Regions:
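Alpha/beta-hydrolase fold nucleophile elbow
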Residues: 44-56
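Catalytic histidine neighborhood in serine/cysteine hydrolases
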Residues: 157-174
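Glycine-rich nucleophile elbow surrounding the catalytic serine of serine-hydrolase chemistry
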Residues: 54-64
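Conserved alpha/beta-hydrolase
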Residues: 2-19
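Hydrolase active-site cap/lid region
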Residues: 64-120, 128
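Short beta-strand/loop motif that positions the catalytic acidic residue
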Residues: 132-134, 139-141, 145
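Conserved alpha/beta-hydrolase "acid-adjacent" motif
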Residues: 146-152
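Alpha/beta-hydrolase active-site loop
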Residues: 23-44
Length: 174
């Protein structure tokens, strides 16, 4: 209040104090975030000017939100260490943590996710969503991030039309 702005920090599905029985990796969460944004706008009205920011899965969610139609009160997006899509992130973790290839587990898990939650791992794509975003976006990523590999931010940055900025933080991990 002292600085003249408000901060809304909602928990995504099945995280923090939020309800839900499964983390949705940002894909269904993007719709929840848009509802929160609209609620904030209803509360603050004409004075609303919004920056949408997220870290890690929240960053992927932020980018997934960015590809949806945006009301005039949204001014820009800030993503910090978000992944390209769920398929890429899960494939990387399957290999890194368990030494397993994509086939057959990724294909089975993708199919089960489609059946249970109505979306697939490749559909849940920050990469496709940022390509549709025409508002400014600031990308932040550590050059030592091995959880969400730094290479992912370069793909995301390349896919996003101008205006955009990229900051690779030297020595920073996830």
């Amino acid at each position: 209040k002292e600085l003249g702005f408000n901060i809304l920090l909602p928990d995504l599905r099945d995280t923090g104090l939020s309800g839900g029985d499964a983390i949705q990796m940002g894909w269904l969460d993007r719709k929840d975030v848009i509802q929160w944004m609209n609620t904030a706008n209803e509360i603050y009205g004409d004075s609303t000017r919004m920056v949408v920011h997220g870290i890690s899965m929240g960053a992927a969610t932020t980018m997934m939100v960015s590809g949806e139609p945006q009301p005039g009160y949204v001014k820009c997006f800030v993503e910090d260490c978000g992944y390209t899509n769920v398929w890429d992130q899960f494939s990387k973790e399957l290999k890194a943590q368990f030494g397993l290839p994509r086939f057959p587990l990724m294909y089975i898990a993708d199919r089960l996710c489609r059946m249970e939650y109505g979306w697939g791992f490749k559909e849940a794509s920050a990469l496709k969503q940022v390509a549709r975003c025409h508002l400014p976006m600031f990308f932040i990523h550590g050059d030592k991030d091995d959880y969400v590999p730094t290479r992912m931010v370069y793909k995301l940055y390349e896919a996003k039309p101008e205006p955009k900025e990229l900051w690779i933080v030297p020595g920073a991990d996830h």
